[in-house]
Amino acid sequence: MQRKIAFFDIDGTLTSEVDGSIPASTIRAIREARANGHLMFINTGRCFQNVEQRFRDIGFDGYVCGCGTNIYCDGRDIFYHPQNHETIMAILNAARKTNVDILFESRKEVCFDLTRPLRHPKALYHYEEFKRQGYDMPEDLENPNFFSDKFVIWYESPMQLAAF
């Protein structure tokens, strides 16, 4: 038998777009593929801390997280490449200049730029969700010790996105 590898996104692939549930048939198929010697990975834009336990409990061989900035295989952290402070500052300045809402994520924390009120409904939703779940949410994005794996922006118009 030739061993194969499969990668699954979380949102809308492993989960239902309607209610976020994971179909039992999906869990069975992943476990059966692993039992047959195939490698099963999650490949997600989420940082590892945002991969909920219900996904980990399915039993994957590894995870490609944070848009490829962090890779885990067989329980080991085999690759990690966060953004450096200079890059983060350039991104933060562009977000402030164009008035987009921005979220920086790392495998340890999530950080919104709160120098002005968040405006986009999805940014507000995620901010409240992270707060409700007790995430570490430092506010000093300009601290030289702050680092991030990835960022997300929310914009109100295509022109705003183009300017960013």
Q: Where would I find each of the regions flagged by the language model?
A:
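Short, basic/glycine-rich phosphate-binding loops at helix/coil junctions
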Residues: 7-9, 70-72, 142
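Conserved acidic, metal-coordinating active-site core of Asp-based
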Residues: 94, 98, 105-164
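Asp-based phosphoryl-transfer active-site loop
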Residues: 4-19, 42
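Active-site phosphate-binding/coordination module
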Residues: 27-123
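Conserved residues at the C-terminal ends of beta-strands
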Residues: 9, 66, 154
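A general structural motif
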Residues: 1-3, 37, 99, 148
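Basic, amphipathic juxtamembrane/active-site segments
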Residues: 4, 18-34
